Amino acid sequence: MRNRYIQSFQEAQIGKKQVPQFKAGDTLRLGIKIQEGDKTRIQHFEGVCISIRGNGVDRTFTTRKMGANNIGVEKTFPLYSESLDSIEVLRIGRVRRAKLYYLRSRRGKAARIKELRK
């Protein structure tokens, strides 16, 4: 049982931000606010969502992309973070798992995810 003040605050935080519906296996493009000195810019990070955990305001998700020289880069974000400017779903993946941690050991074509056909 949560405190009603905390619950009302969390509901207000959730209501402020429009977040698209996505799940593990979807390819996302994230707009991340980067503070450099007194300037703020938006850096895009494009990768596959490999896990979603938690609920409500505490919900986080992890994205993975292959960087330069086939080095995997994973970033975990709170879903309702102020540093996330935008979340865009580029592709909907067809997977049978909620956590795609097995992609960490795959390289190249083996790490591909099939696209969901409608």
Curated annotation (Swiss-Prot):
GO cellular component terms listed in the entry, alphabetical order: cytosolic large ribosomal subunit
Transit peptide as UniProt keyword: no
SUPFAM superfamilies: Translation proteins SH3-like domain
GO biological process: translation
InterPro entries: Ribosomal_bL19, Ribosomal_bL19_CS, Ribosomal_bL19_sf, Translation_prot_SH3-like_sf
GO molecular function, one term: structural constituent of ribosome
Keyword Ribosomal protein: yes
Top-level taxon of the source organism: Bacteria
Keyword terms of this UniProt record: Ribonucleoprotein, Ribosomal protein
Similarity comment: family membership: Belongs to the bacterial ribosomal protein bL19 family.
Function: This protein is located at the 30S-50S ribosomal subunit interface and may play a role in the structure and function of the aminoacyl-tRNA binding site.
Protein name as it appears in the record: Large ribosomal subunit protein bL19
Native organism: Helicobacter hepaticus (strain ATCC 51449 / 3B1)
Gene: rplS
